[in-house]
C-alpha cells in the first residue's frame, strides 16, 4: 500500500485513476485486465464506488491484498467479481484458507523470502501440490521472484498455471526494443 500512498500524494482523486483504467481498457480491447487493490484502498474509495466501477466497466478479475477479514472479499464475490488471493511461499494458513474460500486464481509467491520457508514444503512444486491437496482446482499463478527465463521454466516445471512478471518488465518501459526482447525471452519459456 506504500505505492498507492505515494500515488495519492501526487493525485488524491481516485476518479482519475479509474478513468485511466477505463481508457487503457478501451484502447486495448483484446487484452485481459486483472486489477490489484489493497483492501484499505477500497475502503478509502468507498466499497460501493469500487464495486460499481468494476461491474460497469467489466473489470471482473481482482487480486485483493491486505485483508483485515473476509467481509469485503465476500461482498465482491457475491457481486460477481473473481477475487484472487495472494499466498506467501511459506503457506501462511490464514492466506491458504482465504484462497480456498475464494473464486479467483491463486497468486502464489514464486520464491521464498529468506528465512520464510515451510520445512514441510521447501520447493515451489511442494507448495503447489499442497494447495492442490487442500482442494484448490483453480489456476495457480506464481509471481514475486520471476525475473529471468529460468524462473519461468522453474514455475512451469513446478506445476504453475502461469506467472506474473513485474519489475523486470516495468523497468524497461522507456526502452521499447529491450522491453519487447525481454517479453519474448520470457514467453519463449512458456
Summary of predicted features, one role per range:
Residues 48, 91-101, 134, 142, ...:
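Catalytic cores of alpha/beta
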Residues 95-132, 172-174:
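Glycine/Thr-rich beta-alpha phosphate-binding loop at enzyme active sites
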